[in-house]
Amino acid sequence: MADYLVIVESPAKAKTIGKYLGKKYTVKASMGHVRDLPKSQMGVDIEDEYSPRYITIRGKGPVLKELKSAAKKVKRVYLAADPDREGEAIAWHLAHSLDIDETSECRVVFNEITKQAIKDAFKSPRPINMDLVDAQQARRVLDRLVGYNISPLLWKKVKKGLSAGRVQSVAVKMIIDREKEIQAFEPEEYWSIQGTFALDGEPFEAKFYGTNGKKVELKSEDDVNNVLAKLKGDQFHVDSVQKKERKRNPVSPFTTSSLQQEAARKLNFRAKKTMMLAQQLYEGIDLGKEGTVGLITYMRTDSTRISDTAKAETKEYIESKFGKEYAQNGTKAVKKDKKSQDAHEAIRPTSVERDPKSLKEYLSRDQLRLYKLIWERLVASQMAPAIMDTMTVDLSNEGVLFRATGSKVKFPGFMKVYIEGNDEGKKEEDRLLPNLQEGQTVTKEEIEPSQHFTQPPPRYTEARLVKTMEELGIGRPSTYAPTLDTIQKRGYVALDERRFVPTELGEIVLELMTEFFPEILDVEFTAKMEDDLDSIEEGKQQWIKIIDDFYKGFEERLKVAEEEMKEVEIKDEPTGEMCEKCGHEMVYKMGRYGKFMACSNFPDCRNTKPIVKEIGVKCPKCEKGEIVERKSKKRRVFYGCNQYPECDFVSWDKPIARSCPKCSSYLVEKRTKKQVQVQCSSCDYKEEAN
């Protein structure tokens, strides 16, 4: 019979840890939180210093019964939930439910699930950290005070099922503010002049820079013509050649935020999916003869540091695989963000020796892709900087200056393993110039002016929104993914081509929130609240005072809102179409994900239809219907025939009104981030989109 009981959150984690601890230990899972505030009432006693009234979560009774029974049979119980606020709170609730003294050495924490980390953790158990618990409790109580008071108000004044929260409301505001910027944007005209030149028949490109040594902006076609009129002949003089060596340093290992951003950019993963896969890699994967192994460190962190052991192992790996010149020389200082809690390491593989190829047969495709990203990022972070040779050349003709820039990799360093992605999806390539020297003459081959217009700021992608939230101090590693998930589930925003757009419902709710609860939407207020929660965790402030300072002002605004907030009637709009089932008029209604079409004879007729957008292309299958843009249940855009179900044509890619010149099948637009290519739906024909 076992002497010790270890309680973790999940069966996967229990299985991995159980393998390392041996027969004297029984490892069981609590399946997450066992106690929480009740759903049916506020659960916070405002008169009794905001005391939370916790109850056993529905369905957790049998779990607690099993844990209590197991606890009675052992000498000692260890609580080994995750090493953060949420994990500390789970441990505290378990201690309360199992009558364990929270001041006893019952808490065990580890940053990775490996044999050595588990052994070390069990050598130094500690009491439950009540500062961590209080920080989690303060967040929970704050969110309950806001949500439980404002949500019913929104149900009453707008529609049922709505909710309001501190962080989610600010995220919605950011998306709506960006949409307003886009709508208010007035494009400005500007021009550029691209020149193709040649030295001894070797072509290269340069851009117009200015005149008489000064930079000049081209605002109109007249400006362009004035510049071109100055040029005489095809010969340009090489005025200057500047050659420099530039170092490019590797990026740090992943934090939660940077992992979500990079997985979105490189793998097209949503934040929620990234965290689900990371959790699986952290809790343990069955590696055959090796058994179940935790492959990465804890995935909720805002730290970029790694342990000395991990540094040494990674350096040794780099030297053996790439050579000593590729290993980082000296210790790179880790810049600590003032918002970083830094309680953990960065996200890294638990062993750099487990390269992605060695795990291919044990991981799913998406698990492997995410692991590869994490592994490459760690290795690259400990490698030498890349060294680039850069060259800047100025060419002139009658005082008209063109500038050419080139670069090539002299020493790849970390770039041999990993290059960070960017939101535009552009690939970095060498830009090579001929071996130009001052005083030489080059020949102009072509001059091509181009008209451009300034572009509005882009809508937020998940990656960009997470990055901006992090920069502003809104939310913490554990809250980014749930926040993005919630604002979509509530129907306040939707994703259009992987970018957030506000819904009419989101705009209505934000307008009410702005009028009656402006402080909840204030970025600085929300960021300060996060800092206050951090200070509670550090033992510098009492959680009750933080809550009280917030609630005094909030309570006053709540009273005003209850009296003055007017009901918002979201009226049905006529569509001009008749219901094909009963003959009544179809109307536009507001639903969870925005507008849809429904019969005005509801509830007698329950006919509903999505709002579809014709794209001006005949159906290539039945040749009778029109192709329309639709959205799947997961909000992904696809294209189908408007004669469905008679015609079942469907395509994820947008068909265009041309046939393939090679096989006569229909052509589609294939989108990859910002690149659009025309491809055949049947054969290998491709062409660049105009």
From Swiss-Prot:
Catalysed reactions, semicolon-separated: ATP-independent breakage of single-stranded DNA, followed by passage and rejoining
Alphabetical list of InterPro entries matching this protein: Topo_IA, Topo_IA_2, Topo_IA_AS, Topo_IA_cen, Topo_IA_cen_sub1, Topo_IA_cen_sub2, Topo_IA_cen_sub3, Topo_IA_core_domain
Example of a GO MF term: DNA topoisomerase type I (single strand cut, ATP-independent) activity
Chain intervals annotated as zinc finger (C4-type): 579-605, 619-647, 660-683
The Topo IA-type catalytic domain, residue ranges: 129-558
Domain Toprim, residue spans: 3-121
This protein's name: DNA topoisomerase 1
Organism: Halalkalibacterium halodurans (strain ATCC BAA-125 / DSM 18197 / FERM 7344 / JCM 9153 / C-125)
